[in-house]
Amino acid sequence: MEQAPEDQGPQREPYNEWTLELLEELKNEAVRHFPRPWLHGLGQYIYNTYGDTWEGVEAIIRILQQLLFIHFRIGCQHSRIGITPQRRVRDGPGRP
């Protein structure tokens, strides 16, 4: 009969502690790439939908991860993960 392998990895921190740390890291990254009023609106939407619950925390983590992934994939100027390998050229003279 099959048995699940024993947990032989390092001790993990509690789920809620890890989740809050992940949310904090995502928020810090999101404010570098998206307008604060827009992020505030997203936070208000999540709060109005889920209230102050773990379900709301999980929802905002999921949404921020998706938004950041798409943002980087499309080609964030701060990232090396974009679709096109060449830099985008702007019209007009370059900066001195």
From Swiss-Prot:
Extract the ranges annotated as region (Homooligomerization): 1-42
Is the Transcription regulation keyword given for this protein? yes
Q: Coiled-coil segments, which residues? A: none
Reply yes or no: does the keyword Cell cycle apply: yes
The known PTMs are summarized as: Phosphorylated on several residues by host. These phosphorylations regulate VPR activity for the nuclear import of the HIV-1 pre-integration complex.
Alphabetical UniProt keywords: Activator, AIDS, Apoptosis, Cell cycle, Host G2/M cell cycle arrest by virus, Host nucleus, Host-virus interaction, Ion channel, Ion transport, Modulation of host cell cycle by virus, Phosphoprotein, Transcription, Transcription regulation, Transport, Viral penetration into host nucleus, Virion, Virus entry into host cell
Give the Gene3D superfamilies listed for this entry.
6.10.210.10, VpR/VpX protein, C-terminal domain (1.20.5.90)
The protein's location, in the record's own words, is:
Virion; Host nucleus; Host extracellular space
Record-level GO cellular component terms: host cell; host cell nucleus; host extracellular space; virion component
How does it associate, per the subunit comment? Homooligomer, may form homodimer. Interacts with p6-gag region of the Pr55 Gag precursor protein through a (Leu-X-X)4 motif near the C-terminus of the P6gag protein. Interacts with host UNG. May interact with host RAD23A/HHR23A. Interacts with host VPRBP/DCAF1, leading to hijack the CUL4A-RBX1-DDB1-DCAF1/VPRBP complex, mediating ubiquitination of host proteins such as TERT and ZGPAT and arrest of the cell cycle in G2 phase.
Membership in a protein family: Belongs to the HIV-1 VPR protein family.
Q: What does the miscellaneous comment read?
A: HIV-1 lineages are divided in three main groups, M (for Major), O (for Outlier), and N (for New, or Non-M, Non-O). The vast majority of strains found worldwide belong to the group M. Group O seems to be endemic to and largely confined to Cameroon and neighboring countries in West Central Africa, where these viruses represent a small minority of HIV-1 strains. The group N is represented by a limited number of isolates from Cameroonian persons. The group M is further subdivided in 9 clades or subtypes (A to D, F to H, J and K).
Give the protein's biological function. Answer: During virus replication, may deplete host UNG protein, and incude G2-M cell cycle arrest. Acts by targeting specific host proteins for degradation by the 26S proteasome, through association with the cellular CUL4A-DDB1 E3 ligase complex by direct interaction with host VPRPB/DCAF-1. Cell cycle arrest reportedly occurs within hours of infection and is not blocked by antiviral agents, suggesting that it is initiated by the VPR carried into the virion. Additionally, VPR induces apoptosis in a cell cycle dependent manner suggesting that these two effects are mechanistically linked. During virus entry, plays a role in the transport of the viral pre-integration (PIC) complex to the host nucleus. This function is crucial for viral infection of non-dividing macrophages. May act directly at the nuclear pore complex, by binding nucleoporins phenylalanine-glycine (FG)-repeat regions.
Please identify the protein, giving its name as recorded: Protein Vpr
Organism annotation: Human immunodeficiency virus type 1 group M subtype G (isolate 92NG083) (HIV-1)
